Amino acid sequence: MAEPLKEEDGEDGSAEPPGPVKAEPAHTAASVAAKNLALLKARSFDVTFDVGDEYEIIETIGNGAYGVVSSARRRLTGQQVAIKKIPNAFDVVTNAKRTLRELKILKHFKHDNIIAIKDILRPTVPYGEFKSVYVVLDLMESDLHQIIHSSQPLTLEHVRYFLYQLLRGLKYMHSAQVIHRDLKPSNLLVNENCELKIGDFGMARGLCTSPAEHQYFMTEYVATRWYRAPELMLSLHEYTQAIDLWSVGCIFGEMLARRQLFPGKNYVHQLQLIMMVLGTPSPAVIQAVGAERVRAYIQSLPPRQPVPWETVYPGADRQALSLLGRMLRFEPSARISAAAALRHPFLAKYHDPDDEPDCAPPFDFAFDREALTRERIKEAIVAEIEDFHARREGIRQQIRFQPSLQPVASEPGCPDVEMPSPWAPSGDCAMESPPPAPPPCPGPAPDTIDLTLQPPPPVSEPAPPKKDGAISDNTKAALKAALLKSLRSRLRDGPSAPLEAPEPRKPVTAQERQREREEKRRRRQERAKEREKRRQERERKERGAGASGGPSTDPLAGLVLSDNDRSLLERWTRMARPAAPALTSVPAPAPAPTPTPTPVQPTSPPPGPVAQPTGPQPQSAGSTSGPVPQPACPPPGPAPHPTGPPGPIPVPAPPQIATSTSLLAAQSLVPPPGLPGSSTPGVLPYFPPGLPPPDAGGAPQSSMSESPDVNLVTQQLSKSQVEDPLPPVFSGTPKGSGAGYGVGFDLEEFLNQSFDMGVADGPQDGQADSASLSASLLADWLEGHGMNPADIESLQREIQMDSPMLLADLPDLQDP
């Protein structure tokens, strides 16, 4: 029997008493919902920006349920920024508290990979008329969602650098005891220099330290379904930083394949997609599920085994898949942390413990646990705005320095300052004559000498009292003259420059630090190359001592290879050895002005498609006399390579690896610069220009190839020693949607979708971040699990998930 519907709890924990379910026609409820959403759209799409004369609005970047964001230019400096407007910020308690939370968090954080507040505009209207909040933020051209689902090249180096910046910002955030809870590609802002910043902290929460805080943690929880951690879907009551690491794993997989990893159409479908890859949860996880019906549903499913990540992403980097597997685990305690992920070998290229700071002190969420009214939230937001400006003015006062010379007040009666002359008529002069001798004592006549009397001590002139460190008037005058001269010269050189004012420190980004580290590393490598070169020179001289003394013919003379390049060269050398004797060879045809030999079919054709080879262009036929060694059968690998007998015409055929189809139909990644690229699966065998393909009859024909110049290949491989290690900048970034600035989901897209909230199959699947996000709006459960609205509401209560926006808080909305 269906349970009665209940009104959703607000932020203050109040709830209406439960009542019976009122059966109403579907079209009536749909029309009322459409009117309510249209009203919300009219409220949110207020794009009139009142920013005064300080900023000039350029264009609108995006708008959503919570606000509008536009690009702007500061008139004084010309700096481009993003201004986020939150209209009617105090009409809905949930939205007002979200604004207060985001302002406090962004004021607390100072990190290169977290969006920063540059300014908060003060209200220009009286307090009673204050309704809209304007926040000035960093301007980022695009977001990661737009980059992934566009034609912009996304190499493995891009993926590595984006993941490093994301984990670096996440480590800082988690050290402040803050959980983002809504990480997704559209909330990660990106610019053309591949810099990444985490945005939209409206859903952030603190760590749960007691079971009583679980309900607080799940309040208005609406994380995008495709990136939602299993503990939130299964109500495991274990809410830690591992929630964000699951989202990072989903984003990581989406960058590797350029499509979503778990694009569930509804709650049930989402669980099915996760279990298709990770397998059935362990019995301990199933027993910890808080919702009884969810536990029964999982137990009713047949057991599944996890699928290897190499099968999900064939041809992907092994270290990348190793890190991905440690992020996506059912058990939250088994997932890798952000700090440990930064130490993974996949990110060793960028990892620097000294450049990955923590946040101190931790952020205090005490304000968020209080039951606040609209008026109290408004007062708190105004207080935050004034506090921001007070802090900024305090910092300006600290760094401001006005040059001024204050006269030194001399202490009255100080002898070391006045320095009176010894010949002064004053009675207190220190240099006066010694006093007269005292009168003789009465006694016998001085004709006798008393040997018992001690001779009087010699009278010396008393030295004038002098204080340590005293200076004369002449010295003081010289010092004053030198100071005045220095001051005049400084003021003459720069009248507006303050005396000894510290120069403003230019902010250093993570990319600049990385370039400095790479420059130091490059210099170390150059020194190592010089040492290796000298060592090779000595070895070459030793080898040539017993020979005829002619010049060395070593093609590797003077070149130093890295370990990776050396392994590639050794592999190529093994493949260039003479062919195995099992292969039959056909003698080359007689010389002719225009020889047109064709390759012969091997005795045992290799399985699978053969990738198109690339490499140096073939030389002319007359440049080679006699047979040339050909590549032998390569070692076992993902795709074997064809071999052929030696012949007089060179045909280079370096090895290539052909990728196979992905479990999720993932697109192949563009290989990073300097590494061999993957070929397109299923291509036909390659035939050099000028050579006809074998005829349809399948007659045996001859194949001629020659090894390319080893010196040329070595020089090409050695280019990796001097190339820029950072990923290439984007030539043109697609325009972002503004979601990363916390404006909420796009209402236009929401209104254009059907009320079943399903995601349409087809080419547009990867273009949307997700369907609607709220658990209370998941009407697709009707179709996915055969539920009626009352069942949906009761299950929502059971798994403790509320709505992102309480439409009942709007006074002028109609009740369905």
From Swiss-Prot:
Activated by tyrosine and threonine phosphorylation. Activated in response to hyperosmolarity, hydrogen peroxide, and epidermal growth factor (EGF). The modification Phosphothreonine is found at T733. It holds the Pfam family Pkinase. Residues 407-806 are annotated as: May not be required for kinase activity. Its EC number is 2.7.11.24. The modification Phosphoserine is found at S720. Coiled coil: none annotated. Keywords: Acetylation, ATP-binding, Cell cycle, Cytoplasm, Differentiation, Kinase, Nucleotide-binding, Nucleus, Phosphoprotein, Serine/threonine-protein kinase, Transferase. Residues 502-519, 527-544, 563-573 have a biased composition (Basic and acidic residues). Residues 1-26, 406-737 are annotated as: Disordered. GO terms for molecular function: ATP binding; enzyme inhibitor activity; MAP kinase activity; mitogen-activated protein kinase binding; protein serine kinase activity; protein serine/threonine kinase activity. Residues 476-486, 578-587, 676-685 have a biased composition (Low complexity). Interacts with MAP2K5. Forms oligomers. Interacts with MEF2A, MEF2C and MEF2D; the interaction phosphorylates the MEF2s and enhances transcriptional activity of MEF2A, MEF2C but not MEF2D. Interacts with SGK1. Preferentially interacts with PML isoform PML-4 but shows interaction also with its other isoforms: isoform PML-1, isoform PML-2, isoform PML-3 and isoform PML-6. Interacts (via N-terminal half) with HSP90AB1-CDC37 chaperone complex in resting cells; the interaction is MAP2K5-independent and prevents MAPK7 from ubiquitination and proteasomal degradation. This is Mitogen-activated protein kinase 7. It comes from Homo sapiens. The lineage of its organism: Eukaryota, Metazoa, Chordata, Craniata, Vertebrata.
